[in-house]
Swiss-Prot record:
Gene3D superfamilies: Severin, Villin headpiece domain. Residues 744-783, 846-902 are annotated as: Disordered. Keywords: Actin capping, Actin-binding, Calcium, Cytoplasm, Cytoskeleton, Repeat. This is Villin-4. Ca(2+)-regulated actin-binding protein. Binds actin microfilaments (MFs). Involved in actin filament bundling, severing and capping. Caps the barbed end of actin filaments and is able to sever them in a calcium-dependent manner. Residues 874-883 have a biased composition (Acidic residues). SUPFAM superfamilies: Actin depolymerizing proteins, C-terminal, gelsolin-like domain of Sec23/24, VHP, Villin headpiece domain.
Length: 946
C-alpha cells in the first residue's frame, strides 16, 4: 500500500511544515482539527492525535506523533487513532516517533506540551461536548491528586478524606478558595510544581480571582487555613499510613520480551543478551518492557506491515489487560535514546544527510519508491554563522601559570602567551546586565602533566569558593576552547613546550626532546580567528605538511621572517597575520610568500616541500540543547531529560545539566547541599563519560559551572529568562507560593530573551570609534607596525572610558533623566575630530606635532551642564504619596506576621511612604530608581523587601 500527502485525510494535508503543535480529535472515525485556543483540553470519551513539529538547528524538522486515548473512548476510535497516526507518519517522511498515550499514564514528553497539566473533562463528541473557550457551568468542588517533580500528572479523585495520603499533593478547588494539601512525605519540587496547577485552576476556573491557601500535613488545627481545610472534610482525622503491600506493589521484576511480527502473527525471539543484530530491516518487532512497549519498524517494511504491527501491539495490551501501558513506535535509523539503551550495545547511527529537494536521505528514497510524496520535508538549511560569545569583551583579565602546588600571576604582556605543556587559571570580571560578573576557569595544554592539572583544579576551586560561588567556573582543554575563551583573550598565542617544573621533569624522565618555543629559533604558526577581538597564533610542527591552503602562517628562524598566504584565504586572514606579527616579531621585517610562488629558502626552512591539506579545520556545531536533572548517589549519576524546558524547570534544590554538544553547563540551585555543590564538576565529567545522548561526546568538551543567581548571558540565552526569578530567596516552593498568593510574576524591566545574533560589536556604533582591550587603534585605520605607544596614550584620553563594547548588543535601557533640549552630537563629533586630527598627525605623510591641548566645544560643554542640572532637578523634586496605596514597613517585609494584602511582592518598596522610604533606604525614590537593578535588589534584600 502506498500513499502520498494528497492521498491522506484532508485534515492532514500540509501539516508538519512549521515549528509548533497541531491537534486533531477523532469524530466519526475522521480527524477533525482542534482550534489552537482549545489545545490541552481533552474529553475522557474521545481519542486525539497530537503532532509536535520542532525546527532543528541543522535545518530539518523533527516530528513527534502522539495519539491520546481517554479512559471512556471506544475501542474503534482508539484503533482509528492508531492507524491514522501510522499513515500520517508515512506521509511526513516515515521517521517520526509515535507514542500511544493513555489518560492518567501520559508520557512526560506529551505533558510538556501542555504545561502545567492536562485535566480531562467528562464526556466526549458522542455526548455532544465540544471544545469551547470557557466552561460556563456552575462551580463544583473538586479534589485532585498531583504527582511529578518535573511535569505534573493530575487526576480527579473522590472528594472524601480517604482520598488523602501522606505521599502526594492534593488540590481542593472550592468556589471561593483553592487549597493545596502537601503530604508530609512529598518533596519540595513536587509541591512547587503543584502550585503551577493551582495557578492554572485559579486563572482558568476563577478568572484569577480567588484566595489560595497552603496546608501542611501534620499541622492539625493550629493553623487557621488548616482548620478551614479539614472542616470541609467534616473535621480532622489522622490519615492511614501506606501499607507494606502498597509500598511493594510496583516492585515486581519485569522480563523484557522480543517478538517478531511475521505474516500477521507474533513470534517470540529467544536471546541471552539483547543485541542490535537481532533486528532485521525487512521486519517489525515488539520489544515488551512491561510499563512500556516499543514497536520497531525496519526501513524495508511496507506501510501495510507497519499498520499490522501497530494493531498487534494494541491487541496484545488488551488481551493482557494492560490498557494503561504506553506504546512507542520507532523507525529504523530514528530510534529514541531510551530504545537504544535497552540493548547491550547499539552501533553508531549513520548521519543521514537530508535534502529539501530530494527528501530525507535513504528514508526518503524508500518512501519515493513506494509512491510517497516526500517534497518539502525540510526547511531551507541555515547559513553557518560565526557563533556569538554573549559576553562583554572589555572586562578585566588576570592569568596565572600553575607550577606544582602554586600559581604565578602573569604580566599583562604575557597573559595571552600560553604553552601547550602548561596549565593556567584565568579570572575574568566584566559588566553583566544586572551586576558585575566573573568567570573563573582552567586551561589545560595538550601536553600538560597530570600533577599540574590536579593542582589547577584545586586552586581554581578555592578561588571559586572564595567568590562565594557567585562566579561561573569553566574547565577547558586546548583545542576545544569555546568562543568565550577566545574573545576574553582576544589576541592569543599558543606555543610549543612548557615552562612548569612538572613539564620539565616529565620530559627529562622520559628522555623526550624539549621543544619549548625559543624566540630566535625555528617556529611555524597557524593564524586563525574571526577578527581583531578573536584571533589566535597556534605553533605547529615546522614542516610543510603543517600548511593548509585555508590559512595564513608565520615562519621565523633567527632574523628571517616569512608570512605564507594560502590560496583559499581572505583579506581578513591577511589582516590577522599582520596583527600577530606585531606580537610575535614586532621589530623584524617579513617576506610575503603566496601559495604556489614560494622561494627555495622558505621550503628549506620547512625541510622540503610535501603534500598538505586545503580543507579548513572543522569545528563542531552547537546542537539543539537538552536539559537533564541529575542525581549523584554513591558515585552513580542518574539523569532525567526535561522536555521543552523553561526557566521554571530549574529547581533551587537540584542540579541540572544543559547539553548542547559543543559545551556542557552544570546549573546548581541555591538550596543544593554544600557537599553536593562541591561535586558539580564531577557531575559534568561523569555526564560526558556516560554520553547519555550517544553523541560521541569528547571528555575534553568545555564544562561550565553556573550557580543560581549568577547565570551569565551565554547560559541564559537558552531560555526566556527573567533575572528576578533567579534572585529570589527560599526554596522553589516558597518562591512559587509567594507568586501565587501575591498574584504577580517577578520581573525586571523585561525578561531577557535569546539575544539575536549580530556579528561583531554593537551594530549601532561607528566602527571608527570601536576599540578593545587588545587594540590600540581603530580597525579602520591604516596599520603601521612599530607605532609609538605615545599615540595610544594620547588618543585614549579622548575616548569615553564609560563606553562599553559588547560582543552582542546590550539590552535597551530607558533613560532615567531625559533632557528636553540639547544634543549629544556636538560632544561626540568634537572628540572624534580631535582624535582624527591626532591620527593624521601620526599617520599622515607630513611631519606634525601633537597639540598641547584640545578644547571641548562650547556646544558640548553646554550639553554637559544641561545634563547635570537636569539630574539635580529630578533628584530634588518633592515626592507625592497621593493616589498611592501605602503600608507600614513592618507589613511589607517578607517575614511579616501580618503581611499586606494584594501587593506586588516583587515591588514591596513602592508601598512605603516617601518619609519611610527615605528613612529605610537612606535616599529618595528618584535616587533609588537611578541605581542599577542588581544594586536595588541587594538593598531590598538587606531590608527583607525582596
Amino acid at each position: 500500500m502506498s500513499i502520498s500527502m494528497k492521498d491522506v485525510d484532508p485534515a492532514f494535508r500540509g501539516v508538519g511544515q512549521k515549528d509548533g503543535l497541531e491537534v486533531w480529535r477523532i469524530e466519526n472515525f475522521k480527524p477533525v482539527p482542534v482550534p489552537t485556543s482549545s489545545h490541552g483540553k481533552f474529553y475522557m470519551g474521545d481519542s486525539y492525535i497530537i503532532l509536535k513539529t520542532t525546527a532543528l538547528k541543522n535545518g530539518s524538522f523533527r516530528h513527534d506523533l502522539h495519539y491520546w486515548l481517554g479512559k471512556d473512548t471506544s475501542q474503534d476510535e482508539a484503533g482509528t487513532a492508531a492507524i491514522l497516526t501510522v499513515e500520517l507518519d508515512a506521509a511526513l517522511g516515515g521517521r517520526a516517533v509515535q507514542y500511544r498515550e493513555v489518560q492518567g499514564g501520559e508520557t512526560e514528553k506529551l505533558l510538556s506540551y501542555f504545561r502545567p497539566c492536562i485535566m480531562p473533562q467528562p464526556g466526549g463528541v458522542a455526548s455532544g461536548f465540544n471544545h469551547v473557550e470557557v466552561n460556563q457551568q456552575d462551580h463544583v468542588t473538586r479534589l485532585y491528586v498531583c504527582q511529578g517533580k518535573h511535569v505534573v500528572h493530575v487526576k480527579e479523585v473522590p472528594f472524601v478524606r480517604s482520598s488523602l495520603n501522606h505521599e502526594d499533593i492534593f488540590i481542593l478547588d472550592t468556589a471561593n478558595k483553592i487549597f493545596q494539601f502537601n503530604g508530609s512525605n512529598s518533596c519540595i519540587q513536587e509541591r512547587a510544581k503543584a502550585l503551577e496547577v493551582v495557578q492554572y485552576i485559579k486563572d482558568t476556573f476563577h478568572e484569577g480571582k480567588c484566595e489560595v491557601a497552603a496546608v501542611e500535613d501534620g499541622k492539625l488545627m493550629a493553623d487557621t487555613e488548616a482548620g478551614e481545610f479539614w472542616g470541609l472534610f467534616g473535621g480532622f482525622a489522622p490519615l492511614p499510613k501506606k501499607t507494606s503491600s502498597e509500598d511493594n506493589g510496583d516492585d515486581k521484576e519485569t522480563v523484557t520480551k522480543l517478538l517478531c511480527f511475521n505474516q500477521g502473527t507474533l513470534e517470540h525471539i529467544s536471546f541471552e543478551s539483547l543485541e542490535h543484530e537481532l533486528l532485521e530491516t525487512n521486519k517489525c518487532y515488539l520489544l515488551d518492557c512491561g510499563a512500556e512497549m516499543y514497536v520497531w519498524m525496519g526501513r524495508g517494511t511496507s506501510l501495510q506491515v507497519r499498520k499490522g504491527a501497530s494493531e498487534a501491539a494494541e491487541k496484545l495490551l488488551i488481551d493482557e489487560n494492560r490498557k494503561g501501558s504506553n506504546v512507542i513506535k520507532v523507525i529504523e535509523g530514528f530510534e529514541t535514546i531510551m530504545f537504544k539503551s535497552k540493548f547491550n550495545k547499539w552501533p553508531p547511527t549513520p548521519d543521514l544527510k537530508l535534502s529539501s529537494e530530494d527528501g530525507r536521505g535513504k528514508v526518503a528514497a524508500l518512501l519515493r519508491s513506494q509512491g510517497l510524496d516526500v517534497k518539502g520535508l525540510m526547511k531551507a538549511a541555515p547559513e553557518e554563522e560565526e557563533p556569538q560569545p554573549y559576553i562583554d569583551c572589555t572586562g578585566h583579565l588576570q592569568v596565572w601559570r600553575v607550577n606544582g602546588d602554586g600559581k604565578t600571576l602573569l604580566s599583562s604582556s604575557d597573559q595571552s602567551k600560553l604553552y601547550t605543556g602548561d596549565c593556567y587559571i584565568f579570572q575574568y570580571t566584566y559588566t553583566g546586565d544586572d551586576k558585575e560578573e566573573c568567570l573563573i576557569g582552567t586551561w589545560f595544554g595538550k601536553k600538560s602533566v597530570e600533577e599540574d592539572r590536579t593542582s589547577a583544579i584545586s586552586l581554581a576551586s578555592k578561588m571559586f569558593q572564595a567568590a562565594k560561588f557567585q562566579a561561573a567556573q569553566a574547565r577547558l582543554y586546548e583545542g576545544k576552547e569555546p568562543i568565550q575563551f577566545f574573545v576574553i583573550f582576544q589576541s592569543l598565542q599558543v606555543f610549543k613546550g612548557g615552562l612548569s617544573s612538572g613539564y620539565k621533569n616529565f620530559i627529562a624522565v622520559n628522555g623526550t626532546d624539549d621543544d619549548t618555543y625559543v624566540e630566535g629559533g625555528l617556529a611555524l604558526f597557524r593564524i586563525q580567528g574571526s577578527g581583531s577581538e578573536n584571533m589566535q597564533a597556534i605553533q605547529v610542527d615546522a614542516v610543510s605538511s603543517s600548511l593548509n591552503s585555508s590559512y595564513c602562517y608565520i615562519l621565523h628562524n633567527g632574523n628571517t621572517v616569512f608570512t605564507w598566504t594560502g590560496n583559499l584565504t581572505t583579506s581578513l586572514d591577511n589582516d590577522l597575520v599582520e596583527r600577530q606579527l606585531d606580537v610575535i616579531k614586532p621589530d623584524l621585517p617579513s617576506r610575503s610568500q603566496k601559495e604556489g610562488r614560494e622561494t627555495d629558502q622558505f621550503w628549506e626552512l620547512l625541510g622540503g616541500k610535501c603534500k598538505y591539506s586545503n580543507k579548513k579545520i572543522g569545528k563542531e556545531n552547537e546542537s539543539d540543547p537538552h536539559l537533564f536533572s541529575c542525581i549523584l548517589s554513591k558515585e552513580n549519576l542518574k539523569v532525567k531529560e526535561i522536555h521543552h524546558f523553561t526557566q521554571d524547570d530549574l529547581m533551587a534544590e537540584d542540579i541540572f545539566v544543559l547539553d548542547c554538544r559543543t559545551d556542557l553547563f552544570v546549573w546548581v540551585g541555591q538550596e543544593v547541599d554544600a557537599k553536593l555543590r562541591s561535586q558539580a564538576m564531577d557531575i559534568g565529567e561523569k555526564f560526558l563519560l556516560h554520553d547519555f545522548l550517544m553523541e560521541n561526546l569528547s571528555q575534553d568538551t568545555p564544562i561550565f559551572i553556573v550557580t543560581e543567581g549568577s547565570e551569565p548571558q551565554f547560559f541564559t540565552r537558552f531560555f526566556t529568562w527573567d533575572s528576578a526569578k533567579s534572585l529570589m530567596h527560599g526554596s522553589s516552593y516558597q518562591r512559587k507560593l509567594a507568586i501565587v498568593k501575591g498574584g504577580a510574576t517577578p520581573s525586571l524591566d523585561k525578561p531577557k530573551r535569546r539575544t539575536p545574533a549580530f556579528s561583531g560589536r554593537n551594530a549601532g556604533q561607528d566602527k571608527s570609534q570601536q576599540r578593545t582591550r587588545s587594540m590600540s587603534h581603530s580597525p579602520e585605520r591604516h596599520r603601521i607596525r612599530g607605532r609609538s605607544p605615545a599615540f595610544t596614550a594620547i588618543a585614549s584620553a579622548f575616548e569615553n572610558p564609560s563606553t562599553r563594547y559588547l560582543s552582542t548588543p546590550p539590552p535597551a535601557v530607558k533613560k532615567l533623566f531625559p533632557r528636553s533640549g540639547g544634543s549629544e552630537l556636538p560632544k561626540t563629533s568634537s572628540k572624534q575630530s580631535a582624535i582624527n586630527a591626532l591620527t593624521s598627525a601620526f599617520e599622515g605623510p607630513t611631519k606634525s606635532t601633537i597639540p598641547k591641548s584640545v578644547k571641548v566645544s562650547p556646544e558640548a560643554e553646554k550639553a554637559i551642564q544641561e545634563e547635570g542640572s537636569t539630574i539635580g532637578e529630578s533628584e530634588n523634586e518633592p515626592e507625592d504619596d497621593e493616589n498611592s496605596t501605602i503600608y507600614p514597613y513592618e507589613r511589607l517585609t517578607t517575614t511579616s506576621d501580618d503581611p499586606a494584602p494584594d501587593i506586588d511582592v516583587t515591588k514591596r518598596e513602592v508601598y512605603l511612604s516617601s518619609v519611610e522610604f527615605a528613612e529605610k533606604f537612606g535616599m529618595t525614590r528618584a535616587s533609588f530608581k537611578n541605581l542599577p537593578k542588581w544594586k536595588q535588589n541587594r538593598l531590598k534584600s538587606d531590608l527583607q523587601l525582596f
